């Protein structure tokens, strides 16, 4: 299996890691105290194998949100943190009006962020996501922001309510937030990964956005993650995926620690790395 998504459930002191397989269903691993304590196979609502790339996962309330084509699949969170479950069936779908590569949920604001992955030639994004920022950057992806408290109610999907859009650079694999920063992870192949830090208070920088962006049928404010407001850049090991911010550290999941990329098992790529944030 090839690791992708990364989440932490503090109530259970458990990390969740999503992974896809070359042949077979996608899976979620539960990791506690440095050890894998369970492996759960993902299933569609009809009982067939769920074979998404599972590039991102995040939990909120009773559900784990997993990236899929066109939106997010919902799975009961209890299936992954309680003993006895070997399979988990999808319990709903949230349309995010994009093909999400990652997902992040801010527990403080109850906002859900889901963005696309761009790489020229093989991972193209829609023309609407190619945006020249006020600072002159040529951004190539967009992060859609939703008020998750209005987007769903248990298993009953209500109308998705987008509230904002963030123009972002290419190669983004994951996102998290610290007390003062929005942090994006970017990576491709064996090149070094990077963590990009931007101010969290974008609404203050762009208090009256000059442009809006259409998500579904809704026009929302458009903000920019661009070099003119970049706080800092941190180099990280190759193949960085999703991020978790915990106890003052950004934890980085690495795709290299898999059978597909054997070098990660033979080198230090098999570890989750932590970057201490000083704000």
Segments (PLM) and residue ranges:
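Short coil/turn segments that connect the beta-strands within blades of beta-propeller domains
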Residues: 11-13, 61-62, 108-110, 179-181, ...
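Surface loop/turn motifs at the tips and blade-to-blade linkers of beta-strand repeat domains
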Residues: 41-49, 92-96, 163-168, 231-235
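Loop/turn-rich, solvent-exposed surfaces of beta-rich toroidal or solenoidal domains
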Residues: 165-233, 239-241
């Amino acid at each position: 299996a090839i690791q992708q998504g990364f989440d932490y459930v503090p109530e259970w002191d458990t990390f969740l890691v999503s992974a896809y397989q070359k042949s077979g269903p996608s899976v979620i691993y539960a990791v506690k105290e440095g050890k894998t304590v369970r492996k759960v196979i993902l299933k569609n609502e009809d009982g067939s194998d769920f074979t998404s790339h599972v590039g991102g996962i995040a939990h909120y309330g009773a559900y784990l949100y997993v990236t899929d084509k066109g939106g997010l699949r919902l799975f009961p969170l209890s299936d992954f943190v309680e003993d006895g479950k070997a399979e988990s069936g999808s319990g709903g779908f949230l349309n995010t009006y994009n093909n999400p590569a990652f997902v992040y949920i801010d527990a403080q604001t109850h906002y859900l962020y889901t963005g696309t992955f761009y790489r020229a030639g093989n991972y193209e994004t829609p023309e609407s996501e190619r945006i020249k920022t006020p600072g002159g950057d040529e951004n190539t992806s967009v992060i859609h922001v939703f008020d998750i408290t209005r987007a769903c109610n248990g298993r009953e999907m209500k109308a998705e309510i987008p509230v904002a859009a963030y123009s972002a650079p290419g190669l983004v694999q994951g996102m998290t937030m610290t007390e003062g920063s929005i942090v994006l992870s970017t990576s491709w192949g064996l090149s070094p990964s990077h963590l990009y830090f931007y101010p969290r208070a974008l609404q203050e920088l762009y208090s009256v956005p000059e442009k809006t962006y259409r998500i579904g049928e809704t026009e929302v404010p458009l903000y920019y993650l661009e070099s003119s407001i970049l706080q800092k850049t941190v180099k990280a090991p190759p193949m960085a995926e999703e991020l978790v911010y915990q106890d003052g550290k950004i934890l980085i999941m690495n795709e290299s620690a898999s059978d597909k990329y054997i070098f990660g098992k033979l080198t230090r790529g098999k570890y989750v790395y932590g970057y201490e944030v000083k704000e």
